[in-house]
């Protein structure tokens, strides 16, 4: 079957970008245009010859435009198989004319429900019914019908029509049909997600769920060079989330798979200190190797770096303040993969960009606190609520005879925010709002404690007067006793062990203040 000439087009768009120029070209190619509502008015106001859809259906738009294209003369004209004699005979018998092109984009449901003050009624009115129906009919019959949902495709289709005497290529029609089904799938997922949240349905308890993944960034390879990879924006019950919603890359090489993991880790941790004193986070292999707060960003950098003077090389640095020149010069003295800041002061970017490969990012918005987390296994997908909570001071329970001092409480809360972002088992030593020793990812909590103390000793950081945080309870008193021997004065941990009393007694015996959060922060 030869490529069919496009003689009649149905045009109905919410996003009218480029539609007048596109339709003007269609008219010049001899295409008859039919349209609806606001689109028809836009075309006619531009002086284009376009007819109302009601001239096809013989039926007016009714119910505030809810019903206008749901008609056999529309869908028959789209779905008829052109080389099927029975279809052709039935079309003639019922006064149905073929429609060769559909140009439709949908009511902006996702943009509508993203508004913080959207009403349920507004959301419902932005659920498109006729649009998806026409798109699906046209896409199903892609052998004969060209369907467009994206203004980015207008120029290419026009070029093909000019070259092909008014026809498009079969490969183009198939590609455009695929875009339709990807679009309608994502659209329905957004609607289902919104209604699920409105009804109070918990996604983790649902019998089934759907997520939409759309490629946002290509990558040379994955975690290792022999693994292929890409980064995909995610649409689920909580809406659509993409890298571009929260970060902008200003300079440097393309981002790798490992870079994205580290950016997520750095962004999540620096978010804990939004609105607080100047803070610096140094990440290596998704774990913090240095974190500090200070009166100035430069001092925070110096203190964070002093926690571990080797690991930051090739690391990711995040700041909770605009990066100033003095701090930037200090950071520039070492090799770093990525810098992330809410802004860069005048002249800083010019200086940093002299290292052509280093990635410079601006964090443009606060990362979402809630939502759902997905982790794949070879045999299925795990879904859990994101670990977005952190215990407040009011929620802390002092379980020892000695109350923590105000200074100790400040360090305990600082340590607890960081501890949550370190691979389990985690033991973290903090003093004066600076990490002193990080013990991460060990199978034994005692081993994590040993590593943390060893790391502190390597850089001559004295643990006397420090506090210690543990992401889960101490199963035995030995871990706490080791911390006491190192000079710790206060402890923060979830509690919940059957041996809590033994641990509390050990703390009291060593005059330690200890608080329970009642909340564990395992991170696998």
Curated annotation (Swiss-Prot):
GO CC, any one term: cytosol
Keyword match 4Fe-4S: no
PROSITE patterns tied to this protein: MGS
Molecular function GO labels: IMP cyclohydrolase activity; phosphoribosylaminoimidazolecarboxamide formyltransferase activity
Enzyme Commission numbers on file: 2.1.2.3, 3.5.4.10
Protein's GO biological process: 'de novo' IMP biosynthetic process
Pathway(s) it belongs to: Purine metabolism; IMP biosynthesis via de novo pathway; 5-formamido-1-(5-phospho-D-ribosyl)imidazole-4-carboxamide from 5-amino-1-(5-phospho-D-ribosyl)imidazole-4-carboxamide (10-formyl THF route): step 1/1; Purine metabolism; IMP biosynthesis via de novo pathway; IMP from 5-formamido-1-(5-phospho-D-ribosyl)imidazole-4-carboxamide: step 1/1
Catalytic activity from the UniProt record: (6R)-10-formyltetrahydrofolate + 5-amino-1-(5-phospho-beta-D-ribosyl)imidazole-4-carboxamide = 5-formamido-1-(5-phospho-D-ribosyl)imidazole-4-carboxamide + (6S)-5,6,7,8-tetrahydrofolate; IMP + H2O = 5-formamido-1-(5-phospho-D-ribosyl)imidazole-4-carboxamide
Any single Pfam family the record assigns to this protein: MGS
SMART domains: AICARFT_IMPCHas, MGS
Family statement drawn from the similarity comment of this UniProt entry: Belongs to the PurH family.
HAMAP family in UniProt: PurH
Protein name in UniProt: Bifunctional purine biosynthesis protein PurH
């Amino acid at each position: 079957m030869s490529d069919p000439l496009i003689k009649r087009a149905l045009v109905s768009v919410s996003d009218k970008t480029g539609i007048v120029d596109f339709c003007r070209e269609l008219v010049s190619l001899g295409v008859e245009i039919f349209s609806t509502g606001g689109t028809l008015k836009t075309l006619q106001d531009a002086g284009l010859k376009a007819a109302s859809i009601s001239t096809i259906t013989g039926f007016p738009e009714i119910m505030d435009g809810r019903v206008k294209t749901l008609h056999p003369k529309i869908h028959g004209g789209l779905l008829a198989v052109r080389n099927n004699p029975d279809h052709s005979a039935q079309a003639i018998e019922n006064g149905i004319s073929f429609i060769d092109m559909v140009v439709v984009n949908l009511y902006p449901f996702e943009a509508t429900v993203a508004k913080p003050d959207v009403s349920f009624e507004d959301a419902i009115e932005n659920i498109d019914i006729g649009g998806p129906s026409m798109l699906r009919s046209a896409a199903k019959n892609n052998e004969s019908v060209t369907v467009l949902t994206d203004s980015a495709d207008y120029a290419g289709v026009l070029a093909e029509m000019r070259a092909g005497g008014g026809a498009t290529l079969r490969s183009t029609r198939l590609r455009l049909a695929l875009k339709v089904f990807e679009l309608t799938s994502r659209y329905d997922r957004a609607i289902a997600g919104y209604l699920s949240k409105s009804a109070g349905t918990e996604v983790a308890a649902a019998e089934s769920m759907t997520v939409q993944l759309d490629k946002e960034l290509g990558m040379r390879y994955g975690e290792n060079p022999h693994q292929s990879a890409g980064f995909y924006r995610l649409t689920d019950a909580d809406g659509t989330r993409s890298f571009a919603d929260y970060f902008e890359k200003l300079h440097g090489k393309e981002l790798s798979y490992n870079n994205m993991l580290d950016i997520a880790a750095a962004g999540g941790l620096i978010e804990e200190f939004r609105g607080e004193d100047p803070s610096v986070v140094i990440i290596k292999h998704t774990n913090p190797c240095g974190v500090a707060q200070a009166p100035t960003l430069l001092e925070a950098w110096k203190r964070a770096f002093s926690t571990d003077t080797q690991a930051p090389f090739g690391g990711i640095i995040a700041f909770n303040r605009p990066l100033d020149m003095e701090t930037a010069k200090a950071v520039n003295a070492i090799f770093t993969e990525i810098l992330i800041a809410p802004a860069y002061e005048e002249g800083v970017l010019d200086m940093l960009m002299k290292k052509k490969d280093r990635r410079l990012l601006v964090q443009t918005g606060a990362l979402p606190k809630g939502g759902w987390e997905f982790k794949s296994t070879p045999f299925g997908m795990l879904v859990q609520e994101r670990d977005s909570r952190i215990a407040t001071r009011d929620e802390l329970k002092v379980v020892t005879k000695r109350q923590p001092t105000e200074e100790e409480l400040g360090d305990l809360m600082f340590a607890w925010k960081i501890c949550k972002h370190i691979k389990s088992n985690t033991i973290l030593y903090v003093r004066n709002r600076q990490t002193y020793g990080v013990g991460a990812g060990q199978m034994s909590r005692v081993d994590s404690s040993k590593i943390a103390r060893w790391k502190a000793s390597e850089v001559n950081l004295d643990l006397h007067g420090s506090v210690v945080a543990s992401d889960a309870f101490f199963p035995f008193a030995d871990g706490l006793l080791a911390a006491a021997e190192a000079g710790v004065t206060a402890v923060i941990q979830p509690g919940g062990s059957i041996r809590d009393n033994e641990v509390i007694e050990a703390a009291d015996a060593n005059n330690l203040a200890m608080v329970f959060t009642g909340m564990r922060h395992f991170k696998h």
